[in-house]
Amino acid sequence: MKLKDTLNLGKTEFPMRAGLPTKEPVWQKEWEDAKLYQRRQELNQGKPHFTLHDGPPYANGNIHVGHAMNKISKDIIVRSKSMSGFYAPFIPGWDTHGLPIEQVLSKQGVKRKEMDLVEYLKLCREYALSQVDKQREDFKRLGVSGDWENPYVTLTPDYEAAQIRVFGEMANKGYIYRGAKPVYWSWSSESALAEAEIEYHDLVSTSLYYANKVKDGKGVLDTDTYIVVWTTTPFTITASRGLTVGADIDYVLVQPAGEARKFVVAAELLTSLSEKFGWADVQVLETYRGQELNHIVTEHPWDTAVEELVILGDHVTTDSGTGIVHTAPGFGEDDYNVGIANNLEVAVTVDERGIMMKNAGPEFEGQFYEKVVPTVIEKLGNLLLAQEEISHSYPFDWRTKKPIIWRAVPQWFASVSKFRQEILDEIEKVKFHSEWGKVRLYNMIRDRGDWVISRQRAWGVPLPIFYAEDGTAIMVAETIEHVAQLFEEYGSSIWWERDAKDLLPEGFTHPGSPNGEFKKETDIMDVWFDSGSSWNGVVVNRPELTYPADLYLEGSDQYRGWFNSSLITSVANHGVAPYKQILSQGFALDGKGEKMSKSLGNTIAPSDVEKQFGAEILRLWVTSVDSSNDVRISMDILSQVSETYRKIRNTLRFLIANTSDFNPAQDTVAYDELRSVDKYMTIRFNQLVKTIRDAYADFEFLTIYKALVNFINVDLSAFYLDFAKDVVYIEGAKSLERRQMQTVFYDILVKITKLLTPILPHTAEEIWSYLEFETEDFVQLSELPEVQTFANQEEILDTWAAFMDFRGQAQKALEEARNAKVIGKSLEAHLTVYPNEVVKTLLEAVNSNVAQLLIVSELTIAEGPAPEAALSFEDVAFTVERATGEVCDRCRRIDPTTAERSYQAVICDHCASIVEENFAEAVAEGFEEK
């Protein structure tokens, strides 16, 4: 036997290298085969409910890192709730209707207008479901636990029926109406868009300054006067029917030198405009308040059949332009509102494809709206005072990335204005984890217009509206519920397969259809109405969920998207918000803080991370960032996270190895019988348990990450485990001192594995497989550790906090000695301590082998003053010299008792007593040479 064989060196087959990319799929299959998700739900039946409702990602393409961050975050929350005494099922979902799928089919050569609509919709459905399958596998590969066999999908008959019923309740309450208000219009999609489908980009536009000649000055202005107007949308002059001024803005009547004409502009802008127009020696003839100009009539710049009325509007400012804006009620919300109030014509001169129509005039007809600037300039003639190119933030179609226009077309609207205050009151009851999120959603609802819910597309849920022979729209409870039942049985494609009369209840009559003839609506619903109905289609209709949901968790862009649409439909139907809490996340940016895009080549696919590092590293990364704001991710950043993971793994591997001979049922030492340092570590770990449990409850992942890493690096690695080897390796295998420390090791190992499970389920299960005395098959079926209370815990913490300060001072003394070549390693040191009464009392209270804690071979507590050469602090001083004696071959301490024993071992007296007591046969035979 060799002397080293008398050491209790930790033994384990738990691998140092994780091999996550290959092992994770194996574990995931094992969980699936064991029906782990279902078993967890069965285990928690009857416990308080917690419903995190999954916002549905769009089913198109593989998931990106933003999807991964979101779904991992949800998984961490649901897992932690399941392990904290809650029944917390998770139903993943997908959003499956809308233009992107139509665009994919178009790129594949499918020509929608050349084939049967029902066949086309079947292709859309097949493609959408194929993408659901693809993304389902992507999410499962991340280790996300959920009811993957029974997700919700917005194209299923039950969901579509639930959506129709949401619409029906809103219709019954009078919230659905038809109007021709201007809406965001995408010529590239040939459809109206909701606010949530708009994104803003910089756009360079031609802006024009031109003048309208006064036709009837109402006794205020002469007919040789011109009112100066500014526009950034020259094509809308074709539909201009008025000029809007600010009632309280000051305007001046001016005449530049050498100019026969007189002009009206905002007084505040005169200087800048004079420079822009090349006006010199400008004479101010008169000043007016805007309200004095009200109802003056001007000529249209070129259309002699049109007069333009000067009207008042609150939206006019002097921030730019001339303080006067031309008003085309068919091409803008403000224009429409002031136009209707003043009985202006709502002219629309652009068709659904962005092409100028006949009513724009023969010179414009057939031109694309963006290309008409030269024609407009030609038509303006000498009325044009200046033109310039400006760059401004402009709305774009979020899917096609093309600019959009405002355009008045007949659409179906949900009236938000009718119950806006109810919605705002409900927002006040919701808990927001970011206060700015509450402000953002509140302001959006407060300021938003009515919601245009109709779309002129094919792939979506039809609006369940019929038309009588006289054109009356029919949307009554009887017809809508009948449609819902048909959708529930056959799916929404039935709408296109049957005639209107076959979609109505048997025997249905309407006074507007004396001949019994009806037509059906051909528009579909906005996809935000689809996903915005999920609280009904899923949370209400699934018996395992509770409404309102406890939590909605999505990206911050959903304040104007899913959070918004869900809130409107839920309050409209039931008067309550669909969620009790909202947690929002920022966007995933690249390592430099730039937005990720395929064109820049800076995207990171979750599948690439899984191949290189494993999903576990992506999961740990999610906890390492403050996801309430935008976060950065790159392979370099993930490498750093991987290093942290390695540190966590190897620390836990040490605990596994050094409890391999520990049977908790037989070897556990009662808390009261632990050494002071072991009690301290137990209490410190208990603090970590509380911190992590509280952070899980508050969804504070970064707090968990920081607390965990700090405990492992500072409390364990840099302190407790640093001197632990002197105990667990050296002392007798069954000695009290070793069992005391193993008791703490095992307690930490089991509980920290549970604490890690929501974040690192693969690693936690791997560790669990090595804990033979734990009864649950899987750690995922266990509970998070409870927070404990220990006698005198505050006193113990205070004592050891003071000792840590003392230890830090001692380490400085040892470092100085190392630098002065007095010692090499700390075990070569004889440390002499010169304490005052405070430190002396502290060392007595610690009641431990202080030399062992400081990892020095010899320690002396001296009386009297310290020598001048000592390193002094306020309460203590230190001197360091080389320890006397020889190095013990077994414990490596320098000890004056070290000597060669009769059994061929050069060891100290302490090691000799251990060896002689525990290895009598080897002592009798003598040890082999090293």
UniProtKB/Swiss-Prot annotation:
PROSITE patterns for the chain: AA_TRNA_LIGASE_I (PS00178)
Positions of short motif 'HIGH' region: 57-67
Top-level division of the source organism's lineage: Bacteria
Annotated positions binding Zn(2+): C888, C891, C908, C911
Classification via InterPro entries: aa-tRNA-synth_I_CS, aa-tRNA-synth_Ia, Anticodon_Ile_BEm, Ile-tRNA-ligase, Ile-tRNA-ligase_type1, Ile-tRNA_ligase, M/V/L/I-tRNA-synth_anticd-bd, Rossmann-like_a/b/a_fold
CDD domains (UniProt xref): Anticodon_Ia_Ile_BEm, IleRS_core
First-listed, main subcellular location of the protein, grouped into a coarse class: cytoplasm
Gene3D superfamilies listed in its UniProt record: 1.10.730.20, HUPs, Ile-tRNA synthetase CP2 domain-like, Valyl/Leucyl/Isoleucyl-tRNA synthetase, editing domain
Annotated disulfide bonds: none
EC number annotated for this UniProt entry: 6.1.1.5
One function term, GO molecular function aspect: ATP binding
Broadest EC class assigned to this enzyme: ligase
Residues reported to bind L-isoleucyl-5'-AMP: E554
Co-factor binding details: Binds 1 zinc ion per subunit.
Cofactor(s) demanded: Zn(2+)
Family stated for the protein in its record: Belongs to the class-I aminoacyl-tRNA synthetase family. IleS type 1 subfamily.
Free-text comment on this protein's domains from its UniProt entry: IleRS has two distinct active sites: one for aminoacylation and one for editing. The misactivated valine is translocated from the active site to the editing site, which sterically excludes the correctly activated isoleucine. The single editing site contains two valyl binding pockets, one specific for each substrate (Val-AMP or Val-tRNA(Ile)).
Job of this protein: Catalyzes the attachment of isoleucine to tRNA(Ile). As IleRS can inadvertently accommodate and process structurally similar amino acids such as valine, to avoid such errors it has two additional distinct tRNA(Ile)-dependent editing activities. One activity is designated as 'pretransfer' editing and involves the hydrolysis of activated Val-AMP. The other activity is designated 'posttransfer' editing and involves deacylation of mischarged Val-tRNA(Ile).
Protein name: Isoleucine--tRNA ligase
Species for this entry: Streptococcus pneumoniae serotype 4 (strain ATCC BAA-334 / TIGR4)
